[in-house]
Amino acid sequence: MAAALLPLSAIAQVQPTPAPVTTLPTVTVQEQAIDPNPNAEVGAPYKAKTSADTRHTRPLAETPQTIQVVTGEAIRDSGATDLKQILAAQPGITLGTGENGNAFGDRYIIRGQEARSDVFVDGLRDPGMTTRESFAIEQVEVTKGPNSSFAGRGSAGGAVNAVTKQATLDYDFTRVSAGVGTDSHHRVTLDMNKGFTDKFALRANALTSGEDVPGRSPSQRRRDGLALSGLWELNQDLSVTLDYYGLRAKDKHPDLGGYLVGTVPNRRPATGVPVYAQNSDFLNSDVDTVTARIAYRFAPDLKLTSLTRYGQSDNRYATTGASNGTVLDAANNPIGTAGVLDGGHTGWQDVKYFAHQSNLRWDKQIGSLKHEFIFGFEYTDHKVKSGNYGVTNTGATNCRVSGRNGPQAGWCITDLNGNPVSNLGDLAGRSYERRSWTRDWRVKTFALSAMDTVDLTDQWTVFGGLRADHYDLSLDTRNNQTGAITGNYGFNDTLLNGHLGVSYKINPMGMVYASYGTAQDINGGEPDTGTSSGYGGLVIHNGSAAGAKPETSQNIELGTKWNLLDDKLLATAAVFQTTKDDVMEGANYDTEGTFNTGKNRVRGIELGLAGNLTKNFQLQAGAAIMKSKVLRSAVASNVGNPLSNFADRSFTVQGKYQLTRDFSFGAVARYESSRCGGQPDTGAGYTNGMCSQPVPSFSVYDLFASYRINKHADLRLNVLNVTDKDYYTAVYRSGAFLYKGDGRAVRLTLNLDL
């Protein structure tokens, strides 16, 4: 037995020493929500990596141009819903007022230049002056500086591109959000994507919402929308997408806000102005568009992308304004002041448009250089027919006031002590009847473009392009009561624009660049103003609308961009100068004006930061410091003045901190300096060296917080305008109405991932 055990004992004694145990590092798996946005930076929800416009062939951090992107995550956290609210919070952008179908500030001013017709959806111009909602938006891109080689005519200060949610084969998800809040707020949205086979997917977005305007009840907003996107990938080289977008926006008792009182140097917003909208007032937009996209790869280095869209919108409004008036006694002696209703502002606009755009990308090695060519073709046909409403008043007047043509009876909304009168919503007994058209506007455009991006060395890159637009414009005007044609105008021309940029890569994280770009616009290029020369309408000189040169803008920009913190944070800075020459000038509703007599300049610096400061802290911030000056004008008193509706300082910051796995909180702060109202592209009005129609500066603060209940549900709380600040976003040229920002509002939203 002992002998038998000896070999085992020997084996035991010679067994090797066990290897030391290796302890592997702990791997932390951070759960992230699915982000179907193909342009997003993974792990940095406030940062976009690329532009949705495929003509930008490089990431945003390598593009020698200021392009500000607001991601869908940032939009949802902020609580903003209408596109107007999103853009108003961005640096370098202000809102304007307008009429003729553009009543409420869906008019944007970028770096001091008119941009109400420079709004694009997925790269195609959206010609309707409509209310625009965010329920189907993936991200919003704002390109700063003249941009006609991409956007075509216009775009003197830049352009806005709303990128819509598209079907994808990569994920299946269903998200439902339901919110309630103060001011009778309710909002329900659906975002669902489903792949039915490995080749076909459908995405649906739906919206129903409504609320009283915070602080301005009984003014109300209602939005209902549906967006459908179907993707069919026939094979790895060919895909087809078909989209439908529909929105019904209805505002009851739309509010024109306050008005200015006093005279310079004591010109200021009136206090305690009640909501004086009449019960019959309305602002409605109905939008329907269908878009087809085809992407085909002929070869690994040759790809065609085509978009075709047909759209129509029906925009209608009838609003009532008010201003400060002098109240008279029976003997026509002044006895005080009060707010007085005006005669109303009405308009309707029927828009029909067709657009096709094709871009061919060709990556080609020529010698030692690899080129990224983009060859483009575009055809658009935009038709806008517009008119107004007849106004009937049956309400008894309640005061005697000093009018334009002397003493007259009127409707005072307050008594001499500033107290609102009774039955204010039906004071004028106002009703509206749609009249036939007064303006029939049409522009057909055929465009060709060529662009190239090429690396000269590992550090030097050149980016450039040219675009030619041949347009044919026609405008008929008529008297809608007699039916008589009052004007028939038409002309055509070709515009040539370009851009050129060069960048130097300092290291893998950062680069510096210089860029130059141009833009041109045409006489009568705004579809909503007819021959109202002071509002961007067709300018007639010596009885003719033909013969004017295009307005021309040039931009020089020097900047730097840095991709920091493992590419999760993008920091940008740029200095720029935009000069606009050959500006058409006119006054108010006058048809007669002067061709190419104006010139203005904007200089500034713009800073941006977007992404993750730490793994728990997300940030999007921007600041613009600018100075504008009228260099030449047919009106000598305008020379040297800043541009109208121009804020020389603005900034916004939105931050979110993830305190625990389930709880996050954040805030939004924005500031806009004071500005002077007036007409587009003109010097602000001054009296004795002081602004005649001032809009005060303001700061507004919002708070938000989110709590994840489980992996399928979370709650988000938004408190908008926390301090209930009275602030104003735009003023009419005469100070007769002053658009007011929303008061404090609280929203609670339940988000479900099903």
What are these regions (language model features)?
Residues 248-263, 383-385, 472, 503-557, ...:
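Surface-exposed extracellular loop regions of Gram-negative outer-membrane beta-barrel proteins
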Residues 574-579, 595-682, 723, 751-753:
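Gram-negative outer-membrane beta-barrel transporters
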